[in-house]
């Protein structure tokens, strides 16, 4: 079974629980190709008593028709934005949404004759989901640290975006993934470090996942869907022969073939794995 939960993730989860009261807004990034699997219930347990903004990143790579079916369940928990963090329009939309949330805080404070400080926003999500990309885009190269904030260590860097402050956090996975399907889904979007796993095991689980959810991805390069490990490697060997992925002596380079297939799988567009 594919699993990966290094010690620093457990530590980050503990620290979030301890500092929950410090944050005004939880910005939770999700992968639009994994609208269910990229949701970490451990993070939601910490965030669910505060305002939440869900941002589905990589909306440009998902299936536009299917993703909309998942949105209503998230709208029950918070605000939702579909985005491509490399697109300026998406960043403007996110910035506008955060500023609108600030206005709600400000309106409440005005009734109490109180000034509204910048919102303290923490950005959360599984690894490689785009947290740093979002911070860089919203900050627009402003990387100055702000002053000390109670409950936060000096080593943690807040980015000042005028009406709000942003705090990045390490990517956090679920302590137990629960099934090979989940591990394969996270591996195919690079949220699990494949180089820390057995590459043969990874390719088998991803191949099975695609055979189950998106067999057209395999058929596009003349691979037959299969759930049998022996047959899967037979298909990979044939793929290597067809594409002349060989070592000296006309021997199949299995490792290179697997890496090329993984790269192909990761770059597929118009897809949902959940």
What are the roles of these predicted feature ranges?
Residues 1-26, 32-34, 39-41, 46-53, ...:
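Helix-rich effector regions associated with P-loop NTPase G domains
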Residues 1-2, 135-146:
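Conserved P-loop NTPase mechanochemical-coupling segment
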Residues 53, 60-125, 143, 246:
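Canonical P-loop GTPase G-domain recognition
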Residues 90, 130, 165:
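Short phosphate-engaging motifs
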Residues 93-97, 137, 205:
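Alpha-helical scaffold elements adjacent to nucleotide-binding pockets in ATP/GTP-utilizing enzyme cores
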Residues 119-140, 169:
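Glycine-rich phosphate-binding P-loop
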Residues 128, 133, 143, 154, ...:
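Short, flexible micro-motifs
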């Amino acid at each position: 079974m594919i699993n990966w939960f290094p010690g620093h993730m457990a530590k980050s989860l503990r620290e979030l629980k301890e500092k929950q009261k410090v944050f005004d807004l939880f910005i939770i990034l999700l992968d639009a190709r994994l609208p269910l699997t990229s949701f970490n219930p451990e993070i939601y347990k910490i965030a669910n008593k505060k305002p939440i903004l869900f941002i589905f990143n990589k909306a440009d790579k998902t299936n536009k028709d299917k993703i909309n079916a998942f949105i209503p369940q998230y709208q029950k928990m918070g605000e939702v934005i579909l985005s491509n963090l490399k697109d300026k329009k998406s960043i403007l939309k996110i910035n506008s949404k955060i500023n609108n949330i600030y206005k709600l805080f400000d309106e409440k404070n005005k009734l109490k004759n109180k000034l509204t400080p910048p919102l303290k926003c923490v950005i959360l999500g599984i690894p490689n989901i785009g947290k740093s990309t979002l911070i860089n885009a919203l900050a627009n190269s402003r990387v100055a640290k702000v002053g000390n904030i109670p409950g936060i260590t000096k080593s943690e860097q807040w980015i000042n975006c005028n009406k709000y402050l942003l705090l990045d956090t390490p990517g956090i996975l679920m302590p137990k993934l629960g099934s090979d399907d989940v591990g394969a889904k996270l591996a195919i979007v690079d949220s699990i470090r494949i180089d820390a796993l057995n590459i043969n095991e990874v390719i088998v689980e991803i191949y099975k996942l695609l055979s189950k959810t998106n067999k057209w991805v395999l058929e596009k390069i003349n691979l037959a869907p299969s759930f049998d490990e022996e047959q899967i490697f037979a298909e990979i060997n044939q793929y290597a022969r067809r594409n002349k992925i060989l070592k000296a002596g006309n021997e199949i380079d299995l490792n290179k073939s697997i890496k090329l297939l993984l790269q192909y799988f990761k770059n597929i567009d118009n897809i949902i794995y959940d």
